[in-house]
């Protein structure tokens, strides 16, 4: 009993002596996290309005950012737990911290190359850029690992278009490639996958990147 009392007293003393130190980037980090949360809420609602069901057994927080396991867009294996973790809006706050540590200033360009494997992390990056008034330049590849942006009617191209339409983000997409092996969607699981991915890339209206040598791509 004496040990318990001593432990409680020690904890109380430590609690009183604790000092809350606010991050120097707290305001921007909070804004970025809130923007990402608002974006996720918008995309979740939009996805359901398109008639694309959100499976709560796969996406328990109903973010809409976690796709099916296997579709024509699936390129590789993926970790479902990692996909769920990536939907935390705190990642936008973390990206603010990283950008501030790089001493990026308003108007600085940020080159972003991303596949559909982790749409939430791409969203986090764009939210951080939006808050810090940076200029993101995104090259996106349509292919995605399992449970990424694997639904053909709900790739990140569609997600970003929606967020731009409702005024949450600016259009930062400058080019689209297929992704997959050699960035040419070779060796896909489903027949006709490359054709579908090409259609998605072309329909984006952005520069389409397709080169046989990977270095050229």
Question: How would you name each of these model-derived features?
Answer:
Residues 1-16:
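Hydrophobic membrane-insertion alpha-helices, especially the h-region
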Residues 18-32:
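Ser/Thr/Pro/Gly-rich low-complexity linker/stalk segments immediately outside membranes or between
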Residues 31-90:
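N-terminal, Lys/Arg-enriched amphipathic/low-complexity engagement segments
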Residues 79, 83, 113, 205-209:
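Conserved short-loop catalytic and cofactor-binding motifs
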Residues 95-99, 217:
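Generic hydrophobic alpha-helical segments
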Residues 155-217:
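A substrate-binding/cap region within the structured catalytic cores of diverse enzymes
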């Amino acid at each position: 009993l004496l040990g318990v009392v001593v432990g409680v007293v020690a904890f109380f003393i430590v609690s009183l002596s604790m000092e809350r130190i606010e991050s120097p980037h707290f305001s921007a980090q909070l804004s970025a996290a809130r923007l990402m949360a608002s974006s996720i809420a918008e995309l979740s609602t939009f996805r359901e309005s398109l008639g694309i069901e959100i499976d709560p057994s796969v996406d328990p927080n109903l973010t809409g950012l976690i796709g099916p396991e296997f579709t024509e867009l699936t390129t590789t294996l993926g970790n479902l737990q990692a996909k769920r973790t990536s939907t935390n809006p705190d990642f936008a706050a973390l990206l603010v911290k990283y950008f501030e540590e790089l001493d990026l200033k308003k108007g600085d360009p940020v080159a972003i190359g991303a596949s559909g494997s982790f749409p939430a992390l791409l969203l986090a990056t764009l939210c951080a850029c939006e808050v810090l008034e940076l200029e993101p330049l995104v090259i996106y590849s349509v292919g995605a690992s399992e449970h990424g942006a694997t639904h053909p009617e709900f790739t990140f191209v569609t997600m970003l278009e929606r967020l731009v339409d409702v005024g949450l983000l600016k259009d930062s997409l400058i080019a689209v490639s297929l992704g997959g092996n050699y960035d040419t969607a070779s060796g896909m699981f489903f027949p006709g996958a490359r054709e579908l991915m090409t259609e998605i890339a072309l329909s984006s209206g952005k520069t389409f990147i397709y080169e046989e040598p990977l270095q050229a791509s």
